[in-house]
From Swiss-Prot:
Functional summary from the UniProt entry: Involved in the regulation of glutamine synthetase GlnA, a key enzyme in the process to assimilate ammonia. When cellular nitrogen levels are high, the C-terminal adenylyl transferase (AT) inactivates GlnA by covalent transfer of an adenylyl group from ATP to specific tyrosine residue of GlnA, thus reducing its activity. Conversely, when nitrogen levels are low, the N-terminal adenylyl removase (AR) activates GlnA by removing the adenylyl group by phosphorolysis, increasing its activity.
Cofactor(s) essential for the protein: Mg(2+)
Any GO molecular function: magnesium ion binding
Record's catalysed reaction(s): [glutamine synthetase]-O(4)-(5'-adenylyl)-L-tyrosine + phosphate = [glutamine synthetase]-L-tyrosine + ADP; [glutamine synthetase]-L-tyrosine + ATP = [glutamine synthetase]-O(4)-(5'-adenylyl)-L-tyrosine + diphosphate
Protein name per the record: Bifunctional glutamine synthetase adenylyltransferase/adenylyl-removing enzyme
Gene name as annotated: glnE
Keywords linked to the UniProt accession: ATP-binding, Magnesium, Multifunctional enzyme, Nucleotide-binding, Nucleotidyltransferase, Transferase
Keyword Disulfide bond: no
Cysteine disulfide partners in this protein: none
Originating organism: Xanthomonas campestris pv. campestris (strain B100)
Region of interest (Adenylyl transferase), ranges: 443-937
């Protein structure tokens, strides 16, 4: 026979030859020796004494493995009449199936991912097979557990750790937790309470799998991850589990339950209960407190490694498997409450999700994935050698040679050289994530000042850039002795003492240091009860610096951050400085919330997304990464998406209660800034509601029908209620419906026919002006198109130019007298002379006067598009286009700047603003639309 492993030492070659001979000898005398088996068997014998032992005990298995692509083995059927055979059947099956896993792995038929999945599937199969047999046995002895509501209760077996993640290594124990949905009692001749019933069942299951017999074991079972550990009950009801995690749940248990999965018993009930546990595992907001618990866990493992000299442990040692797991899981826990894609049990998909979200850069993600697969492959080979639960690199030369050659390396040193870069990279990435916060060693006057408060005086604050050091001192002293600070735990107080000096240094570097400090303290006061935000600022210095910068430049964002600390998450989102979402992405972000079954929860999530998205738009505006005119358009797109989402929510609610109006249609028309796609931060929405339905349909078709008109009125009311409902994230929008037909005196909803009649017969010129900027933003497509037709019919009416201009001027004069807040030194950007409303009136007059001849004008609603359209039809001279665009952009930018800093839109008339207003006024004059002078003129 030729040498099967050419590079094997003589001793190893002899060992392999003896192993092959042992397998051959175990075959019955009349059994044929499969052709071509010598070399594959030698390779497997090199890698695994366990497989050789198994083949010696089960020689018939060899013919199965000798197939070109050995399929799965048949699952044993445990005969209820022969429970004494169950253990042997399970152990023989597990040994044979494990031998198949080794065979496929060593011969390259499976990659490491498939091997891990196969080991997981084998454990699940044994669990399910054993539990099914035991359940039948218990039902015969004790009956089934029946809850108070009459439902049959079954045991739920949760797999944690690598079993839950579908990544079980070859010779791993299985971490199990037992639970059951409801309390009750069994209904058999020897009844048991549910707790006792399921505890006994769980203990029998563990024994059937774990106990070592003449046939070995099936799977080592570890029940220590259950609530209260070894001291806890073997099985708990879901209610008991809930109470435990609400009162006793610890940080390390979040890591343990991150991968949890029901693997046997009542799978559906287990999955449903895990959904209720999700808020414990994944906190709603960014949660950097998870890193403290992780540091403690890692420190304990590091101490154990050092104590037992386990530096060669590829699981727990430096740069080992555990560090990759901890790194990925910690980022999952920090962000998984906000990012559903991170709620992933499997490590490699979770790692890819982190890359996709920009939390790990692609090269690092690839390096970690390669390291993980390499380490798991080595780990499996260490365990496959003798079916031992080991993670330590071997010390003996024979074992080293076998592992190295089996993995395709010429010698042990070559394997170590391949392993070292992986461990080095993993250790470096892990250290960067979990490096303990460094305490300042150099003297820091501000740190000393803060720790001394409320004692001391303002002296340390003098000469460092504050305009009013004494006031700053009083603010800081009041904060230091506030009830919120006094109530902090020792750990949170330590964090605050680290954060405060950094915040003070950042504040005095700000353009407005006093305002920055005042706003920082307001934010801290609002967030002290959530220590996760202190942890965020402590763990992420870049977020701290960014926060103070934003607070110093925007009173509005300071208010929003203090009111809704969830926005702090946005400062760490890598997307915050990238391209802003387009119209389709904004729509998707909003309508995705409809997947949440609970209306209140969906509304809260929608609110949070609106807050986050408008915050991103505000930051882009503040940083100059986006033109203000573009920001107002994006804010309108966002509002449009929110209205569309809320309409669907409202329709679902109303239809559940009252059915729907057959053939009926409903549409929401956006007027004003929403219609003109020029929405500001905090703007309300001008809405008009339309409906239509077949004449013969009088009512909705539900169990509690409503008259058709009333149904649509109720729908409009629901939309308004949902848009204005208070949630933990505030409310969506304030709504103004006064632009509907007949204003405040009119019906909340208008039929299409009455709306058409009103626009034709009774609407004032100013209402037709408002219609210029109106557009359908949500609802039935056919009705929206019908609105477009009504708008077209109305706006293309032939008008007397002189009367039109007179009406426009009169309305503008009335608004000026009532709304213009300009004075001798300041201009009202919106209502002042040459301001935004003058520009709107100019363009609206142009459309009303020209649309009969040029209906293409009606395609435009937004100011920039209206300017271009009126130039195109030569109502505005071509040379006025650029100045008007510039004037509009200047006024919008000034207005947004005021809003972002919480100032009224009354500004000193600087040269750029004065020029913009003069351009608008001059062009209006040229069109015979000389508007009344402003109050400050």
């Amino acid at each position: 026979m030729s040498q099967p492993i050419p590079s094997a030492s003589p001793a190893l070659a002899a060992l392999i030859e003896r192993a092959v001979a042992r397998v051959r000898h175990a075959l019955p005398a009349d059994a044929p020796w499969p052709e071509g088996l010598e070399h594959p068997l030698a390779r497997v014998a090199l890698a695994s004494d366990f497989v050789v032992d198994t083949l010696a005990r089960q020689p018939a298995l060899l013919a199965h493995l000798a197939q070109p692509d050995p399929p799965p083995l048949p699952v044993p059927r445990l005969d209820p009449a022969q429970p004494q055979e169950w253990a042997a059947q399970l152990r023989r099956y597990r040994a044979a199936a494990s031998a198949r896993l080794v065979w496929r792995d060593v011969l390259g038929l499976d990659d490491v991912d498939a091997t891990l999945a196969g080991a997981t599937m084998l454990a699940e199969t044994c669990l399910q097979c054993a539990l099914q047999a035991l359940e039948q046995q218990f039902a015969t002895r004790h009956g089934q557990v029946i809850a108070e509501d009459g439902s049959v209760q079954r045991l739920v077996v949760f797999g944690l750790g690598k079993l839950g993640g579908g990544e079980l290594n070859f010779s791993s124990d299985v971490d199990l937790v037992y639970a059951y949905p409801q309390a009750g009692q069994s209904d058999g001749a020897r009844p048991l309470a549910a707790e006792e019933y399921f505890a006994r069942l769980g203990q029998q299951l563990a024994k059937l799998l774990d106990e070592t017999t003449a046939d070995g074991f099936s799977h080592r079972v570890d029940l220590r991850l259950r609530p209260f550990g070894s001291a806890g009950r073997v099985a708990l009801s879901f209610n008991g589990m809930d109470q435990y995690f609400q009162r006793e749940g610890r940080d390390w248990e979040r890591y343990a339950w991150l991968k949890a999965r029901p693997v046997a018993g009542d799978i559906a009930a287990g999955e449903a209960w895990l959904e209720t546990l999700r808020p414990f595992v994944y906190r709603r907001y960014l949660d950097f407190t998870a890193l403290d618990g992780l540091r403690d866990m890692k420190a304990a493992i590091t101490a154990e490694v050092a104590r037992h000299a386990r530096l060669d442990d590829i699981k727990r040692g430096p740069g080992g498997i555990r560090e990759i797991e901890f790194l990925v899981q910690s980022l999952q826990l920090i962000r998984g409450g906000r990012e559903a894609s991170l709620r992933e049990r499997r490590l490699l998909p979770a790692l890819q999700a982190l890359v996709d979200l920009g939390q790990i850069d692609p090269p690092t993600g690839q390096a970690l994935a390669e390291a993980y697969r390499f380490l798991r492959r080595v780990e499996n080979r260490l365990q496959m050698l003798r079916d031992a639960q080991t993670h330590a690199l071997p010390q003996g030369e024979p074992e080293r040679e076998r592992i190295a050659l089996g993995l395709g390396y010429a010698h042990w040193q070559a394997l170590l050289e391949a392993l070292a870069p992986h461990r080095t990279r993993v250790a470096a990435e892990f250290a960067e994530l979990l490096a303990p916060r460094v305490h300042a060693t150099a003297p820091d006057t501000l740190a000393d000042y803060w720790r001394a408060l409320p004692e001391g005086d303002a002296a340390p604050l003098l000469g460092i850039g504050l305009h009013d050091p004494n006031n700053a001192h009083h603010m800081l002293a009041d904060f230091a002795q506030s009830s919120g600070v006094r109530a902090l735990s020792d750990g949170a107080r330590t964090r605050l003492d680290r954060v405060m000096p950094a915040l003070l240094h950042a504040a005095i570097r700000a353009t407005q240091p006093d305002a920055a400090l005042r706003r920082v303290l307001g934010l801290l006061q609002a967030t002290l009860r959530r220590t996760s935000y202190l942890a965020l600022l402590d763990e992420q210095p870049s977020a701290l610096a960014r926060l103070v910068d934003v607070l110093s430049r925007s009173a509005l964002l300071a208010e929003r951050l203090a009111a809704y600390p969830l926005l702090l998450d946005e400062l760490l989102d890598t997307r915050i400085s990238g391209p802003l979402p387009d119209r389709a992405a904004l729509h998707t972000a909003c309508v995705d919330t409809l997947q949440i079954d609970d209306t209140e929860a969906a509304l809260r999530e929608l609110n949070e997304r609106r807050l986050a998205l408008s915050f991103r738009i505000a930051l882009a505006t503040l940083d100059g990464r986006q033109q203000p005119v573009d920001s107002t358009q994006q804010l309108a797109w966002l509002a449009e998406a929110v209205v569309q989402t809320v309409l669907q929510l409202a329709q679902t609610q109303l239809q559940a209660a009252h059915g729907q109006v057959p053939g009926g249609a409903f549409a929401i028309i956006g007027y004003g800034s929403l219609g003109g796609m020029e929405l500001g931060f905090g703007s309300d929405l001008d809405l008009v509601f339309l409906y239509d339905h077949p004449r013969e349909v009088e009512a909705s078709d539900g169990k509690r029908p409503l008259e058709a008109g009333r149904w649509f009125a109720r729908l409009a009311q629901k939309v308004m209620t949902l848009l204005g409902a208070e949630t933990g994230a505030g409310r969506l929008y304030d709504i103004d419906v006064r632009l509907r037909p007949d204003g405040g005196k009119g019906a909340l909803v208008s039929s299409l026919a009455s709306y058409r009649d009103y626009q034709r017969d009774r609407a004032w010129t100013w209402e037709h002006q408002a219609l210029v900027r109106a557009r359908a933003v949500a609802g039935d497509a056919a009705l929206c198109e019908a609105f477009v037709q009504v708008r077209r019919e109305t706006l293309t009416r032939v008008r007397d130019p002189a009367l039109l201009h007179e009406d426009v001027r009169k309305m503008r004069a009335r608004m000026r007298s009532e709304l213009d807040r300009s004075d001798a030194g300041r201009l009202d950007l919106k209502q002042g002379a040459g301001g935004l409303v003058d520009l709107e009136f100019l363009l609206q007059a142009g459309v009303l006067g020209q649309a009969a001849q040029h209906p293409a004008l009606l395609l435009a609603c937004a100011t920039p598009a209206l300017i271009d359209a009126l130039v195109q039809v030569q109502w505005l001279p071509a040379e006025s286009a650029a100045p008007l665009h510039h004037a509009h952009a200047t006024l919008v930018e000034a207005g947004l700047s005021c809003t972002l800093d919480r100032r009224p839109r009354l500004v000193v008339s600087t040269p750029p603003i004065r020029d913009a207003c003069q351009i608008v006024a001059a062009i209006a004059d040229a069109q015979q639309l000389r508007f009344q002078p402003g109050k400050g003129a």
